[in-house]
Amino acid sequence: MANVVVVGAQWGDEGKGKIVDWLSEQADIVVRFQGGHNAGHTLVVGEAVYKLSLLPSGVVRPNTLGVIGNGVVLDPYALASEIDRLAGQGVTVTRENLRVADNATLILSLHRELDALREDGAPGTKIGTTKRGIGPAYEDKVGRRAIRLMDLAEPETLPPKIERLLAHHNALRRGFGLEEISETAILDELTAIADRVLPYQDTVWHLLDEARRGGKRILFEGAQGALLDVDHGTYPFVTSSNTVAGQAATGSGLGPRAIGYVLGIAKAYTTRVGEGPFPTELHDAIGQRIGERGHEFGTVTGRKRRCGWFDACLVRQTVQTSGIDGIALTKLDVLDGFDEIRVCTAYDIDGQRFDHLPASQAAQQRAVPVYETIPGWSGTTAGARSWADLPAQAIKYVRRIEELIGAPVALLSTSPERDDTILMHNPFED
């Protein structure tokens, strides 16, 4: 039996929600280990549809514990709002199905305001932040001035911590020509929400270690995608946290040996939201067709996603940087009916051939994809639940992707419905 880490193998929006929901049926605990409420996913459980941004997928499933780890930056008001929204759908979130790391960093209103100021006022190309305060909160965490969840339980210790926080932020606000924030305002903001979120706090690393030793199955749920990793992604058009699989250990407090199987999620094509390099992006009718058939709009932002052909180079990079054991390939049905399908196998940069995307931003902008053309299929893959249901050419496409990325396809998703999944290898049985 293996614990399983699920990571996006592209730029996010790969369909992790469905796969995590499918796997969470076998898990005892589902753990969020990085990011915040800046990336959402949709879960379909029976007739109910849940849209989550911060809560782990396990909270909507009976007898499963959801855990928010220390690697997450937590907006306490967003957490309370999401809990209330689920209550309206008949899902009660209590300490029985949710625990939050006591050392998780909090996102405050000043973080959201600073995030928006920087994005809206930045000269040149924008990073594409969701303006939810994620980046500024991580900055304060690294700068050792953050307010953490456990601090709300010790209100007498808050004033000096707030003073240290505001010494930094008010200096920034003066630079922006903004009114300074009072310590009382931050204290009131924290005091007003404390009773809503403190009941969930726990020493998460200890809880997870005991669960692991007790033979519990743990599913680590990544947000966004590995190509948005602050170190290994297309910097600076990335998120503010590490999104590769190794972060599951750091962001939960479990040692790396506790991670067994790494499952990467990848679409059968490629999408990206916001700015940044995208070598295989299609600006023609084919890209439009993929976007329309795939319903490519962001769960959280509603922004239209950019669409392009499958980039085997980038997914292969993720296989290597995340140590991916197998891939869940999603949205294969979107490619039904194409006469031919193209796959990027290399890049040409100034006449030189590359099998990976260089870290240089300038080189990324000059990268021209080198394509391999694969015949399409006229039949349908939508709703297929076994290999026998797939057109022969669709199977050849999947097999070629396996060869190019250096990892097997463990699961194949053929529609948004959770049961429309072809299982080749169960990650929990590794």
UniProtKB/Swiss-Prot annotation:
Annotated organism of origin: Methylorubrum populi (strain ATCC BAA-705 / NCIMB 13946 / BJ001)
GO process annotations (BP): 'de novo' AMP biosynthetic process; IMP metabolic process
Gene3D superfamilies documented for this protein: Adenylosuccinate Synthetase, subunit A, domain 1 (3.40.440.10), Adenylosuccinate Synthetase, subunit A, domain 2 (1.10.300.10), Adenylosuccinate Synthetase, subunit A, domain 3 (3.90.170.10)
Record-given protein name: Adenylosuccinate synthetase
Protein keywords: Cytoplasm, GTP-binding, Ligase, Magnesium, Metal-binding, Nucleotide-binding, Purine biosynthesis
Active site: residue positions: 13 (proton acceptor), 41 (proton donor)
UniProt KW Membrane keyword: no
Residue numbers binding GTP: 12-18, 40-42, 305, 331-333, 413-415
Taxon lineage: Bacteria, Pseudomonadati, Pseudomonadota, Alphaproteobacteria, Hyphomicrobiales
One Pfam family hit: Adenylsucc_synt
Main localisation: cytoplasm
GO molecular function, one term: GTP binding
Subunit and interaction comment: Homodimer.
Cofactor binding, note field: Binds 1 Mg(2+) ion per subunit.
E.C. no: 6.3.4.4
First and last residue of the signal peptide: none
Record-listed Mg(2+) binding positions: 13, 40
Stored SUPFAM superfamilies: P-loop containing nucleoside triphosphate hydrolases
Pathway: Purine metabolism; AMP biosynthesis via de novo pathway; AMP from IMP: step 1/2
Cofactors that this protein relies on: Mg(2+)
Catalysed reactions listed for this entry: IMP + L-aspartate + GTP = N(6)-(1,2-dicarboxyethyl)-AMP + GDP + phosphate + 2 H(+)
Gene: purA
Residues that, per the record, bind IMP: 13-16, 38-41, 130, 144, 224, 239, 303
GO cellular component: cytoplasm
Function, as annotated: Plays an important role in the de novo pathway of purine nucleotide biosynthesis. Catalyzes the first committed step in the biosynthesis of AMP from IMP.
Similarity comment: Belongs to the adenylosuccinate synthetase family.
Residues annotated to bind substrate: 299-305
CDD domains the UniProt entry points to: AdSS
